[in-house]
Design a protein with these regions (language model features):
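Active-site neighborhood of divalent metal-dependent phosphoester bond hydrolases
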Residues: 79-82, 92-119, 258
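Short, surface-exposed amphipathic charged segments that create phosphate/polyanion-binding patches used
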Residues: 124-137, 152, 291-306
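Active-site-proximal loop/helix segment associated with metal-binding centers of metalloenzymes
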Residues: 127-208, 212-214
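Alpha-helix termini
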Residues: 72-80, 105-106, 160, 183-185, ...
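Conserved beta-strand hairpin/beta-sheet module of binuclear metal-dependent hydrolase folds
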Residues: 1-46, 52, 149-153, 159-160, ...
Length: 319
């Protein structure tokens, strides 16, 4: 069994605000999930460590950052020879247009760039990982005009077969000596990370018992979807999905700009109390992963940050 050296949330870098940009970088696996605007600017030379990119769909706020990322990988001061694979929902017209643009403006790349179209329920093995780890795609519901996908990071683990539970180590050793290790142990698939992209509520069976589910939460209530596009999720249904799927940690992202951090905290607390949630909830608010239930939750932190930025602009302007 592979135990992460850091808590899962500490292995992530990301940014997400509805309409503007969404991306999440998983440092343990060198994987980028979606590539919204600003990803290369935020990661700087860390972009050279990315080995695979998994795109959930082709909307601009999830793919616009690819242009600069590929340019920096080609010209920046890093390993310009490391290959990059980009997985995307197959037959996506918007992504095909971006690929055409990049082929015209970024010809003669210094590294191998491979675009791989995938469908639902496909597997991608991560050969560069020491453990037996692979990605499995699952279908999401976002746009009627294009296929959208979510991604599970799955680790193959070994466990004791049920019929041998309760036996002592001496008895187990005797069975191993007589029949081999495979007699007492079996492989199981464990979802250690799930990313859903933009989506209506994900099917709980697709992410069942995930250790860490990233699920969009654009709205706090269904009434806030004034245009009734029905392409996104609201808080109550996301919490219910996480409970039904029996996940360990839920990371909410893609929140609307209308909500302050304090409002998100209040509504998340109420929502979790309502369903008596047993899982942990985190929020990717801009570029910060925050625990809204923590006692040291930074009240008015966003307001104070903006005030400091404004004061800095005034000082620099006076100079």
């Amino acid at each position: 069994m592979t135990t992460p050296q850091l808590p899962l949330q500490d292995q992530l870098r990301g940014f997400s605000r509805a309409l503007f940009s969404t991306w999440i970088y998983h440092r343990r696996f060198n994987i980028l999930f979606d590539a919204g605007e600003g990803v290369a600017t935020a990661l700087f030379n860390r972009v050279f460590g990315i080995r695979r990119i998994f795109l959930s769909h082709g909307h601009a706020d999830h793919i616009a950052g690819l242009v600069n990322l590929i340019n920096i990988r080609n010209l920046g001061a890093g390993d310009q020879t490391a290959s990059l694979k980009i997985y995307f929902p197959k037959n996506n017209r918007l992504i095909d247009l971006l690929r055409e643009y990049l082929s015209r403006t970024q010809n003669g790349l210094s590294f191998d760039l491979e675009w791989i179209g995938v469908d639902e329920n496909e597997q991608v093995w991560l050969e560069d990982q020491k453990s037996r780890i692979f990605i499995r795609t699952f279908r999401t519901k976002h746009s009627n005009k294009q296929l959208s996908l979510g991604y599970n990071v799955i680790e193959i683990r070994r466990r004791l077969k049920d019929k041998y539970h309760g036996l002592g180590q001496k008895q187990l050793n005797e069975i191993i000596w007589a029949y081999g290790k495979d007699e007492i142990a079996e492989d199981i698939e464990k979802i250690i990370f799930s990313y859903g992209g933009d989506s209506r509520p994900i099917d709980p069976d697709s992410v069942r018992q995930s250790m860490f589910l990233c699920h969009e939460c654009t709205y706090l209530s269904i009434e806030d979807d004034e245009r009734n596009f029905q392409q996104h999720s609201h808080l109550e249904e996301v919490l219910e999905i996480a409970a039904q799927a029996d996940v360990e940690t839920l990371l909410l992202f893609h929140s609307s700009l209308r909500y302050s951090l304090e409002v998100l905290k209040e509504q998340i607390c109420l929502g979790m109390q309502k369903i008596k949630a047993k899982f942990r909830v985190l929020v990717l608010y801009g570029d910060h992963i925050i625990d809204p239930l923590a006692e040291d939750f930074p009240k008015n932190s966003r307001k104070k940050t903006r005030e400091k930025e404004f004061e800095q602009v005034i000082v620099e302007g006076d100079q």
